[in-house]
Amino acid sequence: MTNAISFNLNFQKFENSINISFPAGLHVIYGESGSGKSQFIYSLSGLKDEQESNFIFTNIVIPEFLQIVFQNPENQILSHTLESELAFASECQTIHPQELQEKLTLLQSDLPFIHDWDRHPETLSGGQMEMLNLVTAFSTNPQLVFIDDGLSFLNDDSKKNWVDWIRNKISRGNVVLWLTSDPTDLAFGDTKWELSLSDFRSLDTIPDLNRYRYRHPKGDLAIKFNDLLFSYSKSDYPVIDNWNCDINQARSIGLIGKNGKGKTTLSKLITGLILPEKGDIQIQLKKKVPRIATLDQFPERMLGADTLASLVSDLVINHKMNSRLVNKCINRLYKYQINWKIIKDQSALDIPWATLRLALIIILGHSEYDVLILDEPTFGLGWKQKMSLSLFFQEILVNKYLILISHDKVFVSDHCDYIYDIDAQIVTRNKTVLINEK
């Protein structure tokens, strides 16, 4: 059975109206941050979105049975255990208990990295949550699936494997519209498209991307650990198993590795948020313990119920930001196309993810912290936003230091003078990003 979809897309301000149809298959739609990818999905699927849109849909013909994989993987999770999360959709279909158990066993086989099904889903890494959400979305055999940047936490190998998995799931004539902020994802599509503020067009080729023109000075950051061991409770295997690292004179350190293999856990050990079972971590800046700030891969966790304005106020009150730098910080936000007046008093949940992430990075960049640990800082950023982030790093890495946790190997290799590959347990010196170094 084929479930083709069609609609008219009208860009009112630009008097541009387009008739679009998608046959069965995987269709990849690229758009910069802020181009309206989430609004595209919400409007086409009939969900309410209070934000003003540059376009409207008419003459919509889509299957009734559809699923959405959301950009923020936490937004899709409803249950308190992994097993109940996996079973939830099937339970809603009132499947016979024996059939449900058989289906649950089959679904679990798609997620072999999970050993304790009583864990809370939020204990997974961002990439692992995305894998879970893909499995739950496809578990009900939908005719149409929207993916809103839902593979952006995955490293290259995992992404290829899951695209193959998706293709296997839609081989009977289903439609998948995958909207992404990463233009390299276009290579996976049966058709390729680009969404902008004024147009929606088909692409024959993938746009050429310029490499980052980035350099920073040599640094004085040192980090060392030997035979580091850490396991989470009820886990059969250690997340960190006798890791070793010795880095000196760094300015920016990149941590790369497969999804769920301990990058975020290592950052928590570095900051002392958790303690190792064996070994210790020494981190020094000019032979002193540095002041460290961490931005979670889920940036809304940093704010909780607070606003960005209250965060800046708290930083000043607690002597973590010089009051004389507040206006400079706000001006920097405007420089990078972030309207402080609009977002400063909004809830974190009401601010677009890419905007919130960039805003927090810029605010921390003006704080008194010496080292910023940024967990997946490029997630959800389009190419232009990544270039802006690169420029900001170049501006602050005269006095600041970075530890970048990322699956984006290109971004890491173009911005880090040391790269720690946790899978291979290898540290690589990368002099190409250093000023006056060959």
Task: Label each residue range with its predicted role.
Residues 30-32, 256-258:
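The feature captures the beta-strand-to-loop junction immediately N-terminal to the Walker
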Residues 45, 271:
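Helix-to-loop junction immediately C-terminal to a conserved catalytic motif
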Residues 72-74, 78-94, 298, 304-328:
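Q-loop/switch helix immediately C-terminal to the Walker
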Residues 99-116, 324-344:
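Conserved ABC ATPase "signature" region
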Residues 120, 149-151, 155, 347, ...:
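Walker B catalytic motif
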Residues 120-124, 128, 347-351:
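Conserved ABC ATPase signature
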Residues 134, 360-361:
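Hydrophobic anchor residue at the start of the ABC signature
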Residues 138, 364-365:
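ABC ATPase C-loop
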